[in-house]
Amino acid sequence: MVGLDSSHLLRDKILCFSSRSHINNQHKKTSYALSLNHMKLPIQRTLAFALARGKGEAESFSRLEATFGDNTSTECTWSFDFPDSKDAMSHLKSEADLSGSNGANNVASVIEKLNALRSHLLAAEKWNASQLHLCDSKYLECATNLVHYMALRSLDIEQLNSHLASLGLSSLDNNNLDVLAHLNASINLLMNDQNAVTESWTNVYPKGKSTKKNDKGRVLSYKESLLGKLREGRSTHIMVTIGEEATLSETFITDILKAGTSVIRINCAHGDPSIWGEIIKRVRRTSQMLEMPCRVHMDLAGPKLRTGTLKPGPCVMKISPKKDAYGNVVSPALVWLCLTGTEPPAHVSPDATISVQGQDFLAGLQIGDSIRLCDARGRKRRLKISKEFHVFNSTGFVAECFDTAYIESGTELSVKGKKGRRLVGRVVDVPPKESFVRLKVGDLLVITREGSLDEPSVTVPGAHRLTCPSGYLFDSVKPGETIGFDDGKIWGVIKGTSPSEVIVSITHARPKGTKLGSEKSINIPQSDIHFKGLTSKDIKDLDYVASHADMVGISFIRDVHDITVLRQELKKRKLDDLGIVLKIETKSGFKNLSLILLEAMKCSNPLGIMIARGDLAVECGWERLANMQEEIIAICKAARVPVIMATQVLESLVKSGVPTRAEITDAANAKRASCVMLNKGKNIVEAVSMLDTILHTKLIYKKSDSENLH
């Protein structure tokens, strides 16, 4: 009886393999069973058994599938006709066989089990030989090791690991980089003869002697081919998401590169080619000037469900001085006055920035001047110039404001200049206020198709309204299913549907309500939705990415079919060198990860995996995220594929300027990944600098714990 390991709640395809021997041209068969009566599986699982055909017949990969429903205790046993006692599986006895032995007998029993396990791995490799032949030569060893690892994971080896530990050997799970070499080393150590065993047990695909140094060298080469060379003193790259704000500052790109950024990420779900091109031009120029290599990664939007665009709010900003509990001003608001695009010095942190039209107006200002204006409410206000700074070829001023003011585009600024001459300037480029709806528990939200937001809802008068540009939502959801917004910040239950509307009752939000704005994520984890791998927009954007970026991110990968479509598009464009980052952010993408990797290894492009923890947590449940992250890292390490850890890394620091303790620990744990991604925010430069410091820090104890997992 061979029990499957139940410690991994979410497991990819489980492969169990067997060989077939011939005695007098007759197949001597033995029946084996797999019992899962002790398992509770949270999602559907598939068991696949690979069987070889008879003598002289071509090898095949036969699949016998059985699935389990959600959270059910399944008493289920399968019987299959397997070969005789030479079958590798038959050597794996029950746990009691080892627990009842000791001394030399115990060692002999462990060796017997390890030999049987090795036969199991080699059989897995042999039966997948036809598929492995299709892998690109640079990934052949990686794919073979991944097959070994998945074959190992198909068995319950917990008891065997326990006995290896009692004999002073490491667990079989501890070295994913070369599973077979680690297994051979364990056998050799137990037999006390390094050359006694491995001579007759070789891979279907021979390779040189595996050592820890060689393994790490190969992994580093895969990392560098995708992400570029590492900064000195670091073993992990830093990726930063930037948008249009990077084009409004002359120093932003320089600052984040100096802080430690080695990869820039652009999200094709936002902006357009004109904005992307300006960002990339600045990154390339600054990287060359600073002699700091920086690669450009562009994420295709993918078939993600998002809220539609809301009408922009008014172009007005609020400037407020700090007040005490009695409403008395304790310190003025600091305002940066400048020409459009002129950033303040790094040590200056203004409360607001006012762009002024008119070089003559700024040129005539002096420290001590008092600027007069009439704000959007008709209130008279003054800004007192306190400091002057020369920034590149421009000049900016810091002004103090002692009263609350609402400034809008077109507001007139005036000041008495030299010889009593009155100088006049106008406020320009005040960004529009972000529009949103504030949702509370019990509220009703009507989601409509794009273009119908202005049409009043007849069915639910007075309800909040948003649009969704994707027809998938309206074609897939049913009443009673849950729906999440903005990475799980808001949850609701679908109350009704029609061809053009979905009615949602809000079940989770903050007590005072949670804002939901434009282009925020929508998740429907219980719905049976079938996306295409690449949308028409993705294919169009891929042409731009191919000629401008170093890497492309493929969003919402779900199965092997998505990879097949991607390979076809890459082949059409002859993009053999473009880095590919597959984003794992759905339940099906996680479930099919090993098969997705094996399919992706059929092309020669540099390959990586991004763990998109935001959507993954919403799709699969917060309580499962940690285990799923570890599972993904372990599988990618076996495949020797670089891992990018993303979503909410140092998010509080990025947004508020102060990190949480949990964020620091999370960032330190991210050392195990090949790259860590930070999202944009007003304190992003400080966040990159802190992350760079954390990644440079080396533990002086337990060195193995800080080694990279890939």
UniProtKB/Swiss-Prot annotation:
Sequence positions that bind K(+): N267, D299
Binding-site list for substrate: R265, K583, G614, D615, T647
Endpoints of the signal sequence: none
Reaction(s) the record says it catalyses: pyruvate + ATP = phosphoenolpyruvate + ADP + H(+)
Pfam family, one: PK
Family: Belongs to the pyruvate kinase family.
Name of this chain's protein: Plastidial pyruvate kinase 4, chloroplastic
Record organism: Arabidopsis thaliana
Species classification: Eukaryota, Viridiplantae, Streptophyta, Embryophyta, Tracheophyta
